[in-house]
Curated annotation (Swiss-Prot):
Tissue: Expressed very weakly in neurons and not detected in astrocytes, brain or liver.
Protein name: Acidic amino acid decarboxylase GADL1
Top-level taxonomic group: Eukaryota
GO biological process: carboxylic acid metabolic process
Transmembrane intervals: none
Gene3D superfamilies, A to Z: 3.90.1150.170, Type I PLP-dependent aspartate aminotransferase-like (Major domain)
Cofactor: pyridoxal 5'-phosphate
């Protein structure tokens, strides 16, 4: 029970505790616990949900597109610990105190829905996806059998089928996963199982030295997956890229031949469509030719760039993707389906996913059920409990239609082009390279460095600029923008356009604000 001091402000819905406890005459007790009736106060709970939803609407949804609001209310960790009541006590907190905590959580959280949040490969607020998330949180389903999740399994099937069509396959299979990293791990394991099915039961002891190949610009999840699966990071061969960050096919084939010469067993090539930093797209047709010649599984990590498939204008970036054996595609990025919404799509239609991952749990996947058990898809996943993530994307797709999703991609890339043109016009801004996608990489050169020769001292000083500007913008709360060093290049900004709430004015503001924050450096 809460202390008297906690209950100075009574809340509607509070009831006399005596009303919740049955009289001793009628009470049924087991181990001293009264079992009569529910012990939750439904009225108080419903009122709390209603008030919390109102708070979310007022403080999150209605402010999501307001550029006058801060992107973040920065506090260092130790200070934030003092500002938030993080302690969990023996007695519960009253509803009004919980609402205060909710307000604090919103206030000090980064507003990723803000039009000037450019920090990651996700951003913005899709209202339809948000409602879908409210629904799934309230329903609390787990997507593994049709009996407990009939609607969401059918939705997932419909969404996967449509995504497979956009890749260009006539048929296929797939599953939604908690992140593109997991999709890449699934694909790596699936390729290994296809190459050496005995590994599932007999393990690695009798297997050859398996080797996989991926771009030097690949996502770091490839190394993590190799480590997690016992393949080993030393058996990940990184293929050199050209000046734009694309895998060089000739270098790939050289490495494949070298691995065979050393007695290793190549089994997988992972190409990337939309690299994390530069936004590069590997030449899929040429890579697929090599995979066919050497009987290698081709996986395409299109977690970031896959959404370009929705655009008739930009889908050429992924030319040849139909030749892949598997594809990772994250609708929660460019298509704003809400984190997490990530699919692994597989060309194989012989139940390879189920063969690779099934454990045939008898308490879940009984074969004598009264309905078609082919809809029980849980054995295609390494998870048991699994969220209905496809529903978020389905709701957005239903609301906007394919043409609306196409317009979302086209507009984001048009805004990117506008920003590139503005960078070229402005003194003190320098593009790293012409972008291929929505990743705009550039340096800001403050006035104090503009007359310096581009030698070691210049680059050493420029390396300090982006982190210092990032600190200032975070503490001011005016915008958020990512930066990084990359393959020998000193720290530069990476700006990504995603949200349809972003305008031309926001692009202009971004450049103006960087100049304002950095001109005295």
């Amino acid at each position: 029970m809460s202390s008297d001091s906690d209950r100075q402000c009574p809340v509607d819905g509070d009831i006399d505790q005596q009303e919740m406890i049955p009289s001793k005459k009628n009470a049924v007790l087991v181990d001293g616990v009264v079992l009569n009736g529910p012990t939750t106060d439904a009225k108080a709970g419903e009122k709390f949900v209603e008030e919390a939803c109102r708070l979310i609407m007022e403080e999150v949804v209605l402010k999501a597109t307001d550029v006058n609001e801060k992107v973040c209310e920065w506090r260092p960790p130790e200070q934030l610990k003092q500002l938030l009541d993080l302690e969990m006590r023996d007695s519960g907190e009253p509803p009004h105190k919980l609402l205060e905590l909710c307000r604090d959580v919103i206030h000090y959280s980064v507003k990723t829905n803000h039009p000037r949040f450019f920090n990651q490969l996700y951003a913005g607020l899709d209202y339809y996806s948000l409602v879908a998330r409210f629904m799934t949180e309230a329903l609390n389903p787990s997507v593994y059998t049709y009996e407990v999740s009939p609607v969401f399994l059918l939705v997932e099937e419909a969404v996967l089928k449509k995504m497979i069509e956009f890749i260009g396959w006539k048929e296929g299979d797939g599953i939604f996963n908690p992140g593109g990293s997991v999709s890449n791990m699934y694909a790596m394991n699936l390729a290994r199982y296809k190459y050496c099915p005995d590994i599932k039961e007999k393990g690695l002891s009798g297997s050859p030295r398996l080797i996989l190949f991926t771009s030097a610009e690949c996502h770091y999840s490839m190394k993590k997956a190799a480590s997690f699966l016992g393949i080993g990071t030393e058996n990940v061969c990184f293929v050199e890229t050209d000046g734009r960050g694309k895998m060089i096919p000739e270098e790939l084939e050289k490495q494949v031949w070298q691995a065979r010469k050393e007695g290793a067993a190549p089994f997988l090539v992972c190409a990337t469509s939309g690299t994390t930093v530069l936004g590069a797209f590997d030449p899929l047709d040429e890579i697929a030719d090599i995979c066919e010649r050497h009987s290698l599984w081709l996986h395409v990590d299109a977690s970031w760039g896959g959404s370009a498939l929705m655009s008739r204008k930009h889908r050429k970036l992924l030319h040849g993707i139909h030749r892949a054996d598997s594809v990772a595609w994250n609708p929660h990025k460019m298509l704003m389906a809400g984190i997490q919404c990530c699919a692994l799509l597989v060309k194989d239609k012989s139940d390879l996913l189920k063969k690779c991952y099934s454990a045939k749990a008898s308490y879940l996947f009984q074969q004598d059920k009264f309905y078609d058990v082919s809809y029980d898809t849980g054995d295609k996943s390494i998870q048991c409990s699994r969220r209905p993530d496809a529903f978020k994307f389905w709701m957005t797709w239903k609301a906007l239609g394919t043409l609306g999703l196409e317009e979302r991609v086209n507009r984001a890339l048009a805004l990117s082009r506008y920003l590139v043109d503005e960078i070229k016009k402005r003194e003190g801004f320098k593009l790293l390279m012409e972008p291929e996608y929505a990743n705009i990489c550039f340096w800001y050169i403050p006035p104090s460095l503009r007359e310096m020769e581009e030698g070691p001292e210049f680059w050493a000083k420029l390396n300090l600029v982006a982190p210092a500007i990032k600190e200032r913008m975070m503490k001011k709360g005016s915008l958020m923008l990512g930066y990084q060093p990359h393959r020998g290049k000193v720290n530069f900004f990476r700006q990504v356009v995603i949200s349809p709430q972003v305008s031309r004015e926001d692009m202009d503001f971004l450049l103006d604000e960087i100049d304002l924050l950095g001109k005295d450096m």
